[in-house]
């Protein structure tokens, strides 16, 4: 964390929204708005001219939309960008695209009277601006070329892979899921901290680039190899064994580590069923979600992989697992597919 004031550029085509955001940000002693842009073209110019620490970027704007502006900014003046998205299906899809193209994080605009409801998400926005300062913008540019791997002798492994991720997760998942072969012999469960709707867009996006079938997990669905299951937003994702098969269940119990879905919840349930055949992968993200789950996996003799700092947008969740001594392997995201193939 820095002692100096965080300089923020606010990009939004609505003059009213620009003032709401300015009021929220300027109310804090450790941050201030240093400029505004009303469209994507102006955003690129101001990013180069003002060199802000953080940019809040509206998605839907005239002349150049948020995603196009983001791509240009990451090329010309790499900066930490937080997308401000609508809670629509289209908004979710564009947000996932933005996260793949270098945005650090996003917040969702609530429905209803803008000024009142936006103030409800003010604490989240301020927290994400502060968190963004832990990110090196150069990390966001890293895009290794990875070719899809093959398995010559696929076997029924009886194993399961559970991947947990938060801030920066879509980028790291992009280096892992699309590079696994169609005959990967273990089901993969992904718990990514995201609101409802966004997890569906994430699944659709990964499915379009992967040989494995990527989908949101459904209540009562059987867990099978050949699939990557994404935990739906706002539900914990559990697993239960029944008549020799394993099924998912969705759980609305209290948040764990202040999140739902929680990685710990899914790892706990998976480890109880799959025991030593559980492989946990803890990717980029703030906080410690996944650490207790990793302990459970180790308790039953399973394997834990933590993402290396090199490819993490936020080195928090993996760092916690490494510091507790639970990580068997510490690897950059692009080397994880190879290790998973070796382990299954």
Curated annotation (Swiss-Prot):
A Pfam family that this protein carries is CheB_methylest
Record carries keyword Phosphoprotein = yes
Q: List the molecular function annotations (GO) for this entry.
A: phosphorelay response regulator activity; protein-glutamate methylesterase activity; protein-glutamine glutaminase activity
Identify the domain of life: Bacteria
The EC number(s) this enzyme carries: 3.1.1.61, 3.5.1.44
> What InterPro entries would the database entry show?
CheB-like, CheB_C, CheY-like_superfamily, Sig_transdc_resp-reg_Me-estase, Sig_transdc_resp-reg_receiver
Catalyzed reaction equations: [protein]-L-glutamate 5-O-methyl ester + H2O = L-glutamyl-[protein] + methanol + H(+); L-glutaminyl-[protein] + H2O = L-glutamyl-[protein] + NH4(+)
The CheB-type methylesterase domain, residue ranges: 154-344
Cellular component (GO) terms are: cytoplasm
Task: State where the protein is found.
Answer: Cytoplasm
- Record key words, sorted: Chemotaxis, Cytoplasm, Hydrolase, Phosphoprotein
Query: Post-translation: what modifications?
Result: Phosphorylated by CheA. Phosphorylation of the N-terminal regulatory domain activates the methylesterase activity.
Q: Which GO terms describe its biological process?
A: chemotaxis
Q: Which residues carry this modification: 4-aspartylphosphate?
A: 58
| Ranges of residues in domain Response regulatory | 7-124
Positions annotated as active site in the UniProt record: 166, 193, 289
HAMAP family per UniProt: CheB_chemtxs
PANTHER family from the xrefs? PROTEIN-GLUTAMATE METHYLESTERASE/PROTEIN-GLUTAMINE GLUTAMINASE, PROTEIN-GLUTAMATE METHYLESTERASE_PROTEIN-GLUTAMINE GLUTAMINASE 1
What's the family? Belongs to the CheB family.
- Function noted in UniProt: Involved in chemotaxis. Part of a chemotaxis signal transduction system that modulates chemotaxis in response to various stimuli. Catalyzes the demethylation of specific methylglutamate residues introduced into the chemoreceptors (methyl-accepting chemotaxis proteins or MCP) by CheR. Also mediates the irreversible deamidation of specific glutamine residues to glutamic acid.
How does the record comment on the protein's domains?
A: Contains a C-terminal catalytic domain, and an N-terminal region which modulates catalytic activity.
What name does UniProt use for this protein?
Protein-glutamate methylesterase/protein-glutamine glutaminase
According to its UniProt entry, this protein's organism is Thermotoga maritima (strain ATCC 43589 / DSM 3109 / JCM 10099 / NBRC 100826 / MSB8)
């Amino acid at each position: 964390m820095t002692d100096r004031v965080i300089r923020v550029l606010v990009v939004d085509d609505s003059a009213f929204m620009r003032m709401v955001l300015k009021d929220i940000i300027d109310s804090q002693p450790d941050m201030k708005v240093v400029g505004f842009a009303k469209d994507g073209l102006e955003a690129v110019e101001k990013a180069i001219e003002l060199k802000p620490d953080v940019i809040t970027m509206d998605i839907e704007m005239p002349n150049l939309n948020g995603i196009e502006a983001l791509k240009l900014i990451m090329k010309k003046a790499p900066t930490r960008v937080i997308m401000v998205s609508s809670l629509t299906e289209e908004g979710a899809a564009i947000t996932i695209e933005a996260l793949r193209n270098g945005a650090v994080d996003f917040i969702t605009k609530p429905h209803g009277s803008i000024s009142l409801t936006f103030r409800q998400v003010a604490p989240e926005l301020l927290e994400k601006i502060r968190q963004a300062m832990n990110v090196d913008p150069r990390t966001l540019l890293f895009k290794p070329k990875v070719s899809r791997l093959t398995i010559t002798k696929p076997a029924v492994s009886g194993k399961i892979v559970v991947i947990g991720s938060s801030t920066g997760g879509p980028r790291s998942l992009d280096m892992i899921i699309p590079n696994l072969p169609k005959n990967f012999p273990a089901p993969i469960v992904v718990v990514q901290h995201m609101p409802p709707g966004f997890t569906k867009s994430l699944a659709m996006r990964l499915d379009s680039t992967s040989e494995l079938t990527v989908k949101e997990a459904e209540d009562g669905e059987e867990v099978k190899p050949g699939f990557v299951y994404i935990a739906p937003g706002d539900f914990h994702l559990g697993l239960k064994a029944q008549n020799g098969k394993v099924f998912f269940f969705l759980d609305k119990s209290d948040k764990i580590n202040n999140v739902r879905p929680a990685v710990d919840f899914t790892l706990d349930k998976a480890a109880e069923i799959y025991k030593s055949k559980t492989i946990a992968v803890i990717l980029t993200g703030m906080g410690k979600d996944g650490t207790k789950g990793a302990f459970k996996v180790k308790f039953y003799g399973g394997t834990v992989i933590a993402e290396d700092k090199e490819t993490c947008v936020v080195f928090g969740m993996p760092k916690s697992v490494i510091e507790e001594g639970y990580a068997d392997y510490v690897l950059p995201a692009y080397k994880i597919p190879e290790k998973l193939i070796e382990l299954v």
